[in-house]
Amino acid sequence: MRIGISGLQTTDLVAKSIKETLSDAGFESFYFKNNSKATLADLVIVLGGDRGVRNYLHSAIDVDTPVLGISESESNGVLAQIELKELPSYLNRIKKQDYVIEDVPRIGVKIDGKNTYPVLNDVSVFTSKSATLMEHILRINGEEVWHDSSDGVIISTPIGSSAYSMSAGGPIIFQAANVFGIIS
């Protein structure tokens, strides 16, 4: 199994340490900063906590390689669920393929008719002038299902539901739910 190692803020020392740990466990690994190389891996370890995983997923648009998010500090997150010091204990499970791959829903966005990268947390649309109402319509398959006026709208994935949308009064959405939150 080939494991790619990615992380924008990762020091060479940390990457070298992880490569050694993986090599000792019998894995072939390589460090990359250009996400086009992610397709060469069977699994990608992303360092830098939730922020590192978000950054990686935003730039790895067409990559379907499973990701293991690792926090380099003492705190776990939603996307980076293990700490760096725990990696050796997880390698045996990786070898046996004793893990579950979860699909993470993202929101496709077009700005001025051009696709942007798929959004992991949320999309916010506001007027350019503060305290000004805007009108928005939600259409699904061309059919209008919702019409509202407000100073903005937030569309959130389940992962993003515990971030900005929650602070705007939106619900926390169960991670496995196949829905988006719309907060107006």
Regions found by a protein language model. Name each.
Residues 147-184:
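Gly/Ser/Thr-rich active-site loops/lids in small-molecule metabolic enzymes
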Residues 46-48, 69-71, 156:
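Short beta-strand segments
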Residues 49-52, 73, 159-162:
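Short glycine-rich anion-binding loops that position phosphate/pyrophosphate groups of nucleotides
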Residues 1-47, 52-62, 82-103, 110-117:
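ATP/NTP phosphate-donor binding region
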Residues 64-68:
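Proline-centered loop/turn at the N-terminus of a beta-strand
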Residues 73-151:
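Catalytic core of DAGKc-family lipid kinases
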